[in-house]
Amino acid sequence: MTPISQRISQKSPKLRETKQIQMTTTDKSAGIVTDSEAGPETSLLLNPHEGSTKKAPSDSYHFAYIIYFTLGVGFLLPWNAFITAVDYFSYLYPSTAVDRIFAVIYMLVALVCLFVIVVFYAHKSLASFRINLGLLLFVIALLVVPVLDLVYVKGQVGLYAGFDVTSAAVALSGLGDALMQGGLIGVAGEMPERYMQAVVAGTAGSGVLVSLLRILTKAVYPQDPDGLRKSANLYFAVGIVVMVICAVFYNVAHKLPVIKFHEERKNEELIREKSEEKGSLTGLAWRTTLWDIVTKVKSHGFGIVLLYMVTLSIFPGYITEDVHSELLTDWYPILLIAAYNVFDLVGKCLTAVFMLEDEKIAVGGSIARLLFYPLFWGCLHGPMFLRTEIPVTILTCLLGLTNGYLTSVLMILAPKSVPLRHSETAGIVTVMFLVVGLASGSVIAWFWVI
């Protein structure tokens, strides 16, 4: 075992954000200090070589938090735009299972690219380069649909060459997701937990934004081909604007004192590692270290896979296809999806108030969510009172709330279970687990009906 591997196997570095009054504590059971205990920016850097203590500057006006939240909104918005416009694509290409094909393309490309990044490039490429490249690919992919619609499709049905180009744009978005999400989660993992919480909450914010747009377009535009076309173009236009905002925000973030502090902290760790190891990790040494990182976060990853397997096998397929309401008619699935997204956001924001610091309990919660299967089954086949709008709405809200909270907990804890210098890689590995969960849930949704 290499020296790096030995250090990863030793004491978990959960003390990296200890309160000032406990900064000399070395008790391994101290755990991660929450923002409510130590304040959002009281992280301390203990440099054994200098014998000095550096205190992180405050996040003035919460600019850094807002930036990371916005970036979280950004990397899921392209996928949300494609999948929300599926009604228009289904109209254009009636003999194609558009939503299923898009899901396979997007997730397969994202998963393969994440694997390549984590194995070959994560330890020797800059996260800033990957994030900016991902944003550029997102903008290009989002431009494809409205430009294609303007110059070629023009609302005509059956031009399947247009579907091929659109599918290529979905694949490009999957690549952009792997680059941006992997890099962003990795960078957030190197910082105090409030920034990972901001990113994760941003992903839920993306869902809420798209739900609001869907409600707006349904209320404003007629549900005919022209209305569907205008709605789709609006989704992609909003997506492009948000991508530009994300690009500006991310490249401005490095000028904030709090971001500079944590970047310098990471650089000091890297310099110390190279001096102790007499060089950078390459080849077999890196693969051994990577395996140790995977071992450290495997329980978190299992919980995340299970979370999204359950969620995606029920939502949105079951909610949009299997339940009906005479009262709410075609508004019913739209409102259920909005309810899920709102409570997913609430759950992901709750970790800013109360942070569960034991991953075993969080994984247990992920396992307990298997109970949603018989509960939703009861809403279809059980007693009549379970088949009404109220039980389905309550279960949908609980599905979103538990998904949001447990996702946030596991995503925050995973990078903190390894040394700081490996937090970025741990974050990327965790994203791989997340994509596996998404893919598993989508497959179950296709072949198994509640």
Curated annotation (Swiss-Prot):
Its main location: membrane. Induction: By nitrogen deficiency and 5-fluorouracil plus methotrexate. It comes from the Eukaryota. InterPro entries: ENT1/ENT2, Eqnu_transpt, MFS_trans_sf. One of its GO terms (molecular function) is nucleoside transmembrane transporter activity. It is a multi-pass membrane protein. It is found in: Vacuole membrane. In young seedlings, expressed in root elongation zone, root cortex, root-hair, at the transition to the shoot and cotyledons. Expressed in hydathodes of fully developed leaves and pollen. One of its GO terms (cellular component) is plant-type vacuole. The chain crosses the membrane at residues 63-83, 101-121, 133-153, 168-188, 196-216, 234-254, 300-320, 334-354, 361-381, 394-414, 430-450. Keywords: Membrane, Transmembrane, Transmembrane helix, Transport, Vacuole. The keyword Membrane applies. Belongs to the SLC29A/ENT transporter (TC 2.A.57) family. Nucleoside transporter involved in adenosine transport and required for nucleotide metabolism which influences growth and pollen germination. Has high affinity for adenosine when expressed in a heterologous system (yeast). Plants over-expressing ENT1 have decreased leaf content of adenosine and show growth deficiencies. Plants silencing ENT1 have increased leaf content of adenosine and decreased rate of pollen germination. This is Equilibrative nucleotide transporter 1. It comes from Arabidopsis thaliana (Mouse-ear cress).
